[in-house]
Amino acid sequence: MKLSIIIIATSLVIAVVAFPSKDSKAIENDKTEQRMEIVVQETARACSKQIGDKCKRNCECYGKTVVCGTIYVGGKEVNQCMDKTSDSAILNGLGKGMNFIENTFSFCV
């Protein structure tokens, strides 16, 4: 009986020493104040650019099969509104179909 009381008392002392109360000392995160800043960027809400105009998103380009595509001019990447995807009529037709699907899922407002 005495041995079990000694074991329990020792266990409680170890627990108290090993796990101090949170109230006894504030941790560093409790002392700091955290803020979050939300920045809202205005984006195009309607199709306003024609084929050949520079763009950043599909929503900016006007037309069901017109997308904001990337071309390389002098080794430099340029984004512009385009609907032609190939010189081949068959491939161009397939490309316009893909552009239409891409515009459908762009969720432009």
UniProtKB/Swiss-Prot annotation:
Origin superkingdom: Eukaryota
Principal subcellular localization: secreted
Keywords: Disulfide bond, Ion channel impairing toxin, Knottin, Secreted, Signal, Toxin
Phylogenetic placement of the source organism: Eukaryota, Metazoa, Ecdysozoa, Arthropoda, Chelicerata
Cystine residue pairs: C55-C68, C59-C108, C61-C81
Identification of the protein by name: Hainantoxin-XVIII-4
Cellular localisation: Secreted
Tissue spec: Expressed by the venom gland.
Signal peptide boundaries: 1-18
Record remark on domains: The presence of a 'disulfide through disulfide knot' structurally defines this protein as a knottin.
MF (Gene Ontology): ion channel regulator activity; toxin activity
Function: Putative ion channel inhibitor.
Propiece residue ranges: 19-46
Family: Belongs to the neurotoxin 25 family. F7 subfamily.
Coiled coil (UniProt feature): none
Cellular component aspect of the GO annotation: extracellular region
